[in-house]
Swiss-Prot record:
CDD domains, alphabetized: cytochrome_b_C, Cytochrome_b_N
Species for this entry: Clethrionomys rutilus (Northern red-backed vole)
Subcellular location: Mitochondrion inner membrane
Binding-site residues, heme b b566: 97, 196
Amino acids binding heme b b562: 83, 182
PANTHER family, sorted: CYTOCHROME B
Bilayer topology term: Multi-pass membrane protein
Name this protein carries in UniProt: Cytochrome b
Annotated signal peptide: none
Any further remark recorded for this protein: Heme 1 (or BL or b562) is low-potential and absorbs at about 562 nm, and heme 2 (or BH or b566) is high-potential and absorbs at about 566 nm.
């Protein structure tokens, strides 16, 4: 068995990635989220495949086909809710994974980090298009509002929006192409995941101390396979509790009303995992400015290696920057809350203040804190 594992051209790739991979001996549970994201991707592809067997991407039958899946298909309700809530679990793991990378300075592995940002954009695009497919009120109006943002692009904006819509409004052509892209993107994401892993295994994993761990490595299997398995059990337990007891708690009631272009919902808002970015978008009075700020709210992650001023890699031994980091986390929670609120006083001003704080903490306060800590520790 050992000979096959180490000599077979295909199996040895798996061996080097998941079995004999040298891993730091001190990585904590915060390093479990990579494998959990892999699990989420597998769950989404499998449940999505079975949903696609029964779904019809036509405006007249899309809503009915989702109802048919839930009512008439064997365990269709389970597959549908696992897919919908699996997306939420996916984003919870994504945010924690990115947060871990920010805390422990993993962004210094630039290729891995940049590939991660591309993956984040791809997953967000996939989730957005998936939300349109049930063709409920929030699906239709969410698609209309978000795609319409592209009209803010000077000169080509309007033409671009109509090209994406396949007409003069969100209609049959839009739904069909969104279904096509929603189906193909997870497979592209899978390919990008392998590139992400390829870059990671070039440098090796980071660890909580931020120090070089070459002198103290252990094999990935059995130590981290069993550790990952515990994470898998916790994730699946959480997902099944959500699916079986509270399947609609993260959804929007408006999406149980079929799409109607003549009736606008009182509050148009995306799924909860986009609310922080939506709040940043809404806090800018100018349309183009809002769109640019929205993109920058994610793209700013690519600047983190340039904004790193500390002589230490992670925040483990840096209390001032730690404080800044947790204020940033609180700020993101405030933005998520604001994104779900109506556009009126006092939510507008709170959203604007939280948006300014978000960029200020990342661009100004965290780099400053790093320099202050260097001086305190006399590391200059």
């Amino acid at each position: 068995m050992t000979i096959i594992r180490k000599k077979h051209p295909l199996i040895k790739i798996i061996n080097h990635a998941f079995i004999d991979l040298p891993a730091p001996s001190n990585i904590s549970s915060w390093w479990n989220f990579g494998s959990l994201l892999g699990l989420c991707l597998i769950i989404q592809i499998l449940t999505g495949l079975f949903l696609a067997m029964h779904y019809t991407s036509d405006t007249s039958t899309a809503f009915s086909s989702v109802t048919h899946i839930c009512r008439d298909v064997n365990y269709g309700w389970l597959i549908r809710y696992m897919h919908a809530n699996g997306a939420s679990m996916f984003f919870i793991c994504l945010f924690l994974h990115v947060g871990r990378g920010m805390y422990y300075g993993s962004y210094n592995m630039i290729e891995t980090w940049n590939m991660g940002i591309i993956l984040l954009f791809a997953v967000m695009a996939t989730a957005f298009m998936g939300y349109v497919l049930p063709w409920g009120q929030m699906s239709f109006w969410g698609a209309t509002v978000i795609t319409n943002l592209l009209s803010a692009i000077p000169y080509i904006g309007t033409t671009l929006v109509e090209w994406i819509w396949g007409g003069f409004s969100v209609d049959k052509a839009t739904l069909t192409r969104f279904f096509a892209f929603h189906f193909i993107l997870p497979f592209i994401i899978t390919a990008l995941v392998f590139v992400h892993l390829l870059f990671l295994h070039e440098t090796g994993s980071n660890n909580p101390t931020g120090l070089n761990s070459d002198a103290d490595k252990i094999p990935f299997h059995p130590y981290y396979t069993i550790k990952d398995f515990l994470g898998v059990l916790i994730l699946l337990t959480g997902l099944m509790i959500l699916v079986l007891f509270f399947p609609d708690v993260l959804g929007d009631p408006d999406n149980y009303t079929p799409a109607n272009p003549l009736n606008t919902p009182a509050h148009i808002k995306p799924e909860w995992y986009f609310l922080f970015a939506y709040a940043i978008l809404r806090s800018i009075p100018n349309k183009l400015g809002g769109v640019l700020t929205l993109i920058l709210s994610i793209l700013i992650l690519a600047l983190l290696p340039l904004l790193h001023t500390s002589k230490q890699r992670g925040l483990t031994f840096r209390p001032i920057t730690q404080t800044m980091y947790w204020i940033l986390v609180a700020d993101l929670l405030i933005l998520t809350w604001i994104g779900g609120q109506p556009v009126e006083y006092p939510f507008i001003i709170i959203g604007q203040m939280a948006s300014i704080a978000y960029f200020a903490i990342i661009v100004i306060f965290m780099p400053m804190a790093g320099m202050i800590e260097n001086n305190i520790l006399d590391l200059d």
